[in-house]
Amino acid sequence: FTTANVTVRDLLCHRTGLPRHDAYWIDGPCTRKEMVENLRNMQPGWSFRSHWCYQNTCIVAAGMLVEEMTGKTWEEFVKKEIFEPLGMTRSTFYVDAIEADANHATPYDRPTPVELQGIREIPFLKSDREDMAKGIGAPYGPAGSIMSTVNDMLKWVQFNLNNGRVGDKQLISEAAMKEMHKANMLMSEPLLMPCKEMDFFSYGMGWFVETYRGHVMVEHGGNINGFSALVTMIPDQKLGVVTLTNFNDSFDTYATTYEIIDRVLGAKGGDWNNRWREFVGQVFAAQPEQMKAMNPVRIEGTKPTHDLADYAGTYRNATYGDIVIENKDGKLFFTYNKKTSELDHYHYDTFQINDVFALFNGMTLRFGIGNDGKIGEILFGIALNPAVGEECFKKVTE
């Protein structure tokens, strides 16, 4: 039903019923085409058009539609139809271009994902499939690959505030721009910090549409390894704010943006820096209990049903590809998308991922036994969403 009825609007409004399913493409081997084809394998979390959930692969699918309709790559189309007319001369899709520019920001992150204070330098996120010389962008490109500057992004903001017009040329119809900027899918609560200044939450097409101190606010944030961005507009004030930072998963962009907007509006009492700091502290403090709730209650004094060597092998899932389990020196190791982590025995045939830098750190996975008495599958909540539950990875026979 969904395949027969889904529209471009559904893709851009994140209302297909699919949860994020991000883990398979982060450092994954898929091409852009394979990413989109993989949508057919994904388990939905909700019925079609009943629930909002951000879904990056759906945005990639919309980008692929541009390629199918124009005969150009998404990168070629955006460069010719957006970057060049707007004069966005320092915007690119390629990590190589950034690293070749002496005036570029270095990406940073926290020392570990569980530490709130401190920083460490990290590498740029670069897909193995990215090839600037051949004009091939990252597979996930349409969902988040543009690297830019404040000055270039302000040109993009001005273009939006001018309803698709640059100079005397209407690049996108005013009607289309208004469709993108209006509420298309209601949200029951804010994505991040609840605050008294905001009382309406929805999603347009590629934009969050909210109210802020009585004004319609159109905004969108983004995070990718070592960088955070927030673009915000108050259309009735012809006000646009772009906040960029070279720090991973930073909420400072919101505190800074709301403070700037308040000063322009003449509003007082926001105290955004302290409020966001308190919110982030609460988020971090809640993480251990959230992880505990995701895992089964541990049963002490148990042991695996098989020798560790019997668990080793390759396990495959249609959506997520391969998990490789290795037995080394009396320990099991878990490898997914080139990242290897140690497994600790949890209870019976359930093991826990022990790697503070791993996406799945602290999560448990369980091995299933087939009718032949052999280890035959892994059951793992890799979708990171209780609406989907566990995915089954079947052991590949040699």
Stretches found by the model and what they are:
Residues 235-269:
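Contiguous hydrophobic, core-forming segments of folded domains
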Residues 219-220, 230-233, 237-246, 377-380:
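Short, well-ordered beta-strand elements
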Residues 1-225, 230:
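Short, surface-exposed loop or secondary-structure junction motifs
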Residues 89, 203-205, 216, 227-231, ...:
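Structural beta-strand/beta-sheet cores of well-ordered domains, especially the beta-sheet scaffolds
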Residues 212, 234-236, 328, 347:
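Structural motif
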Residues 108, 207-209, 231-233, 324-325, ...:
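A structural signal for short hydrophobic beta-strand segments in well-ordered beta-sheet cores
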Residues 187, 196, 258-398:
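Peripheral terminal and inter-domain segments
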Residues 225, 248-250, 359, 383-384:
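A short acidic/small-residue loop/turn micro-motif
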